[in-house]
Amino acid sequence: MAQNIHDHRILILDFGSQYTQLIARRVREIGVYCEIKAFDITDDELNEFNPKGIILAGGPESVTQLGGPRAPEGLFDRGIPVLGICYGMQTMAEQLGGRVASSEKREFGYAQVKVRAKGPLLADITDHLTPAGDSLLDVWMSHGDKVVAMPEGFELLASTESAPIAAMQDLSRNLYGVQFHPEVTHTLQGKRILEHFVLTISGCEALWTPAKIVDDAVRQIREQVGSDKVLLGLSGGVDSSVTAALLHKAIGDQLTCVFVDNGLLRLHEGDQVMDMFASNMGVKVIRVDAEDLFLSKLKGVNDPEQKRKIIGNTFIDVFDDEAANIKDVNWLAQGTIYPDVIESAASKTGKAHVIKSHHNVGGLPETMKMKLVEPLRELFKDEVRKIGLELGLPYDMVYRHPFPGPGLGVRILGEVKKEYADILRRADAIFLEELHRADLYHKTSQAFAVFLPVKSVGVVGDARRYEYVIAIRAVETVDFMTARWARLPYELLETVSNRIINEISGVSRVTYDISSKPPATIEWE
């Protein structure tokens, strides 16, 4: 029998760092399953999870303050290898009898650490050598406190000028701490450091691969739903598309997809979804044309948050009505992914702050007495894409730019009208077509057009035109937490502008959005 791909696993304890999910993604990239849990995990939860290694992530608090988060009591006495990163190293030091103090000189950004001792964590890793032959590593720091005295049993592993104890180790107990962040790309050898901890020190095998993930998911789906029928709301987005392909591989005709065309999709998107899933893959897809219903509900509504809620609730109503017509369905499938699970858990602690409400089915309506199947709930977005390719979905579908759940409803500023949606659909298609032609689509992280409900004077021939304005936006980002506007060639922008104005009746002006995030968000609403 094949080995369970979850058998070799790493536990990441979250102390509130913005980088915690990045650590998990790096561990998964190494080929090892991991999960993020809150720092105050119980003994029973720890025993049940049974990790081969534990990583203590960073956090915004100070170890020097009373009442700050700490690792669970007895964690370091379990005989399980532990790696503390930044705050994780500091709380390890403090809890084991060392000392942490505020730095006179804070370290934020690039630093060079000198390796001071031999050990498996930094073995054979170097970026530069000193004249004396000592190893130097280029790393990324982000800390205001520092360890000033190591606990008993630890030795100095690395140092910088402003952090004399930049890394430490207790080889007898397999405890390691690094003040820098190996999970970020600025730490050049960060992936190798994490590999050493995960594979060498913790003894994990790299079982977490796309092919094995698909096989495991198919097995789990079959075990979970048996011979029951499953219903999925198919949007055409990456998550729902991969969910559909995975379910279809697992249970075939037991799956029925409902595709709600709300009139707020991209140009020809509805037909493309039907061609891909119904025609090419043989998936049962029911297409519901609900454009008139959505537009009538949105009439006169200007507030973006209200628009999001109306679109989300109307989707549930339409989906609910359609589901009622399908007999003997026991399961509802959703494309929930791991960051959704983490954020949902964070919101229950009361520490999350909603900037925009995120559109999803968002749970089962009371009237739908179905059980939930979420085959992607363990996966990060980059893993979902790899699974999509493994399942045979086209590259352009799997790696298409993000599209908001409410669709063009939040790319039309103010009230949504059919006229506006038709104009925007065509403008957006022209922009993306030209990006593809210039081989720049996959070099930008997200690109789209926005409809501005203001009119501007233009001139065509001898005639004045008083027509609408289209804004185009393209950004580059690693994590969508921050983003810079894409420096697209002027010639490309000129072509896009000329085509939109000449080919679309009703547009007299095109602008390019050069706002970065922060302070602006990527989407306009």
UniProtKB/Swiss-Prot annotation:
It catalyses: XMP + L-glutamine + ATP + H2O = GMP + L-glutamate + AMP + diphosphate + 2 H(+). It is an enzyme of class 6 (ligase). The active site is at residues 86, 181, 183. PROSITE patterns: GATASE_TYPE_1 (PS51273), GMPS_ATP_PPASE (PS51553). Keywords: ATP-binding, Glutamine amidotransferase, GMP biosynthesis, Ligase, Nucleotide-binding, Purine biosynthesis. NCBIfam families: guaA_Cterm, guaA_Nterm, PRK00074.1. This is GMP synthase [glutamine-hydrolyzing]. It comes from Marinobacter nauticus (strain ATCC 700491 / DSM 11845 / VT8) (Marinobacter aquaeolei). The gene is guaA.
